[in-house]
């Protein structure tokens, strides 16, 4: 019979303590972080609205018991659901991530920090509706932005130096940990309870990357973050009851996360938690493509226009060379059959072939009917990726954080176009001035997919005015985003 020992008298692992003290005590005073988080909120909500056009996403959303409405429940943008906070977090989070079009963070581990908005927004709406019913003020959207900045920071700072993919774990583990800490603080848990909650996140069984790679790449990658951020809300609620935590969840010999799941290695950290990640986050603005391919797609679009001017088409191409960085080759350099949209949007050859044939890359282009065009697979076979060590160094340089690709297209007549090299995608911090107007256009287009012109106007009047937005109540904003 195994023994059960209560370990609450142990000191918590420093890594857990640092997360909790940051969430409770660090004051965000960066205007750049707040302004960027506002853009991030708009973009993330828009991504969720676009996902509602896809039945594969919609079938997963809503109450577990069909037709159920929870009193004072969480609203899900673009729908009329009223859900409990856990299922609300899943529905918001799954919609956000479905099309792989929300923000990105690239480091030793990659990920999409705005995935945390599923748990944050569900918690904020649920708390606020109960506050208002009790005669108390709602949380403000500034509170939501603060939570976003902190969740981004936790996920992104751990990711800077620590590769979960190299041990086969999916990056949504960091969504679970970051969301747990932030939503627990939003709920008003004590420091001890938040420590317990974060430890519970680390001792959970963690998602494997199985569903992101050949031969099993599939649609779970589109709802994995929704699952993680909703699990975070559940763990925070469990901790709120007074349930115990596990102080050495990371460092316990044999049974802790490091020994079980991280090959005995401990996390290393490049910088303390502040607001660095939100300030430097990457937005997917132009194309719904895995971020390591964004600059390659942009280069392919430029080459397509030159091909048109030269009177050439994709059937005239003999070879395509792509100079790229190591992470791109490791994650999205694929040969062979691609079985579904989730497989295609993580294959650089597919994402370059489509714009060279059609002069576009949209979410629809990953669907089966488009993929059936034989020209796509024929062109994929002609694409060769090769690592450029300088691109890899600049990818990891914290002052550059480039995501460079260089594309050259060779033709059967011996001519060529390129090389076209692009270091930074439109959504990069170094191209913010160029990118933000395009991001707002993306948001407006996504609003138009769901709302009437009058509804769009009301939403834009509030959400696109930064000062009005940050002072607005969560319930006011969420009520605007409900599908009437």
Located regions from the model:
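Structural helix-adjacent loops and short alpha-helical linkers that scaffold large soluble proteins
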Residues: 127-145, 188-195, 244-248, 308, ...
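Well-ordered alpha-helical scaffold segments within catalytic/enzyme domains
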Residues: 51, 120-130, 180-187, 235-239, ...
